[in-house]
Curated annotation (Swiss-Prot):
It catalyses: 1-(5-phospho-beta-D-ribosyl)-5'-AMP + H2O = 1-(5-phospho-beta-D-ribosyl)-5-[(5-phospho-beta-D-ribosylamino)methylideneamino]imidazole-4-carboxamide. Keywords: Amino-acid biosynthesis, Cytoplasm, Histidine biosynthesis, Hydrolase, Magnesium, Metal-binding, Zinc. Zn(2+) binds at C81, C97, C104. This is Phosphoribosyl-AMP cyclohydrolase. Catalyzes the hydrolysis of the adenine ring of phosphoribosyl-AMP. Its cofactor is Mg(2+); Zn(2+). InterPro entries: PRA-CH, PRib_AMP_CycHydrolase_dom, PRib_AMP_CycHydrolase_sf. Pathway: Amino-acid biosynthesis; L-histidine biosynthesis; L-histidine from 5-phospho-alpha-D-ribose 1-diphosphate: step 3/9. It comes from the Bacteria. It is found in: Cytoplasm. It comes from Clostridium botulinum (strain Alaska E43 / Type E3). Binds 1 Mg(2+) ion per subunit. Binds 1 zinc ion per subunit.
Length: 109
């Protein structure tokens, strides 16, 4: 399946053009973060070897690690049963969270 065919499987309509992308560590399976992807950021992710997201606050694409050097190298991408969420397993270089923590999910509620 080519990249366009892979993108067309996904239902972007439910999220107003965005889908949630759960990022997990490839080896430990720890959830590192949740980001949102547009068709364009997903295409860039599928074309390369690092993750791209759509920033809802800045309203633009961003490559995770482009500023910090904490890139997420893609190992595997899976889609959920409703075709509206993806799970990306990565080899995380450095911290995934902007706070410097390995995971964005480090606080108890």
């Amino acid at each position: 399946m080519n990249i366009e065919e892979r993108i067309n499987i996904i239902n972007f309509d439910k999220g107003n053009g965005l889908i949630p992308a759960v990022i997990q560590d490839y080896k430990s399976k720890e959830v590192l973060m949740l980001g949102y992807m547009s068709k364009e950021s997903l295409k860039k992710t599928l074309e390369g070897d690092t993750t791209w997201f759509y920033s809802r606050s800045r309203r633009k694409l961003w490559n995770k690690g482009s500023t910090s050097g904490h890139f997420q190298y893609i190992k595997e991408i899976k889609i959920d049963c409703d075709n509206d969420t993806i799970l990306i397993s990565v080899n995380q270089k450095g911290a995934a969270c902007h706070t410097g923590n390995k995971s964005c999910f480090y606080r108890d509620l």
